[in-house]
């Protein structure tokens, strides 16, 4: 279980997160939605060790992760697929995926994980020798998903996974996320598009100005008229 309690964090002395309380149960999928500047991506930066909170407690399975380095957090099984592409464009697809297991020193284990990931993501096999830079944005996103699974993570954080995708690739990404859900992994995703993110989540959290405005099931949030002012076009169900 992931728990944040009274977390304040920000940049240059200005808090972006202002007393965040959040709980993500093991094996569930939770989506954070909200307008630009609400603090969605800042939550992920704090959880990945890239930003230290000024105040507050963060625990993962009962262990405090405040002050841990990104590498230490990765070793706990917490991985993130960032919003911007993070592949090495000059390396082949399969080698990019293999690098996801750089912390593992058991060659046989790495190869076994690679085979498992190839079954889940056919693109790792069909484009194995192609340079990652030759792939479309959506294809690169699929490869990034594959790479993040090489460490068999316990918590996967996705920062706007549907951003900039064509309809066909978007459908592939959604199916991939659902496959990861069925494997029992815990998923925390951030989405600008409320309907997209909440439709594939069990739970949702709405952030407004660095604070939790509403949390509950995706149906509760989509149908709540009180938060329509956060989005153009009225309520979240119309977003």
Description of each model-found segment:
Residues 131-135:
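Conserved ABC ATPase signature
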Residues 33-35:
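The feature captures the beta-strand-to-loop junction immediately N-terminal to the Walker
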Residues 48:
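Helix-to-loop junction immediately C-terminal to a conserved catalytic motif
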Residues 148-149:
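ABC ATPase C-loop
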Residues 12, 30, 68, 91-112, ...:
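ABC-type ATPase nucleotide-binding domains, specifically the catalytic core motifs of the NBD
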